[in-house]
């Protein structure tokens, strides 16, 4: 079983969605120097950005927004006929400093956590592999 901690962000649509609407997993990396600065941004109402899950460097998983709500991670997006993918996806941020701060590969703990979390979400929401 994949365990995670709750870490609240106010940045999400207040209307609940049905689980049957979830059909995509979208992965991002933070591109910020520290986990602290990334989490601060994800929780700052001025930033208007969030995600459902955040994978820390040590592999710990934080749930930022409950799955039943729409987080703000995909912006103005589309895939095939679907538009505004925030409505139909789970957003997962993996902490990585990115190209501006000496990019490094994702570490073993992060990879294990993302695989485990993804497997849980794929099974729970019946997400097709081509929708990841």
Language model features: what each stretch is:
Residues 2-128:
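Active-site-adjacent loop/helix surface patches within enzyme catalytic domains
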Residues 131-132:
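Acidic helix-start/capping segments at beta-turn-to-alpha-helix junctions
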């Amino acid at each position: 079983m994949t365990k995670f901690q709750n870490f609240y962000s106010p940045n999400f649509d207040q209307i609940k969605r049905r689980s049957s609407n979830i059909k995509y997993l979208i992965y991002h990396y933070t591109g910020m120097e520290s986990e602290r600065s990334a989490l601060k941004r994800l929780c700052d109402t001025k930033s208007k950005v969030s995600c459902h899950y955040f994978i820390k460097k040590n592999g710990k998983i934080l749930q930022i927004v409950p799955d039943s709500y729409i987080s703000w991670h995909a912006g103005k997006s589309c895939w095939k006929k679907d538009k505004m993918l925030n409505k139909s996806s789970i957003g997962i941020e993996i902490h990585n400093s990115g190209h501006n701060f000496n990019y490094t590969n994702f570490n073993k703990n992060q990879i294990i956590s993302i695989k485990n979390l993804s497997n849980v979400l794929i099974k729970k929401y019946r997400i097709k592999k081509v929708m990841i």
